[in-house]
Amino acid sequence: MRILLTNDDGIHAEGLAALERIARTLSDDVWIVAPETDQSGLAHSLSLSEPLRLRKISDKHFALRGTPTDCVIMGIRQVMDIKPDLVLSGVNSGSNVADDVTYSGTIAGAIEGTMQGVRSFALSQAYLYEDGARIVPWEVCEKHAPALLEKLMVLDLPEGTFLNLNFPNCRPDEVDGAEVTMQGKLAFNLQVDARSDGRGFPYYWLKFGERAGAFVEGTDIHALKHNKISVTPLKLDLTDYSVTDRVARALGYGAQV
């Protein structure tokens, strides 16, 4: 089995090293095409205004000056001589749950793999800030991901569907199994931090405020809160079929879908 790895935290990220160790429990034919620099929050974006620069680090290890989407495209269409059987994107430093999935470059890696016709999974590891430092328990995903992936790889997923895996912030022995979930809802509370440079010109940082939401049972955020691995099936089709009839009636037509 051939596996292509990517991420959005960059080629030197600890999560990518963890993902490689996970992948090597499944296959010895593991390829990496990951961004040269951190591409967090770029979602499913393409580089169309600048050329892509590919750097070979070692055999089957490449860094690309581009987005996670660029990396998957380059990996499948340029770097690898034979199409991979599996695309793994991650392991992200921090969970990708609720509305996070719309911003996530990690999710985008799995989206692009799916669009290229390859079974794809996104993996993310929740963490805790302690005394101003980010403490990421990589050992959780490293312990539990291999067996979980072995079970999930045999699934006959519908075309256009991929899986979003999130691992809880706890000790490996505290993980209370895996749960199939749906997306939850968290308020982002994004804030704009206005500053001035040394010449008095304004510049701005986006930052997250306190996040709040209802941790409804069955959602990804509820699963993580209760030390469960969240497995959420996601699909490329963004059509809201529940309102197509109403939209059609508003336009004076019959049902269209």
UniProtKB/Swiss-Prot annotation:
Its cofactor is a divalent metal cation. One of its GO terms (molecular function) is metal ion binding. SUPFAM superfamilies: SurE-like. Binds 1 divalent metal cation per subunit. It is found in: Cytoplasm. Transmembrane segments: none annotated. The keyword Nucleotide-binding applies. It catalyses: a ribonucleoside 5'-phosphate + H2O = a ribonucleoside + phosphate. Belongs to the SurE nucleotidase family. This is 5'-nucleotidase SurE. It comes from Rhizobium johnstonii (strain DSM 114642 / LMG 32736 / 3841) (Rhizobium leguminosarum bv. viciae).
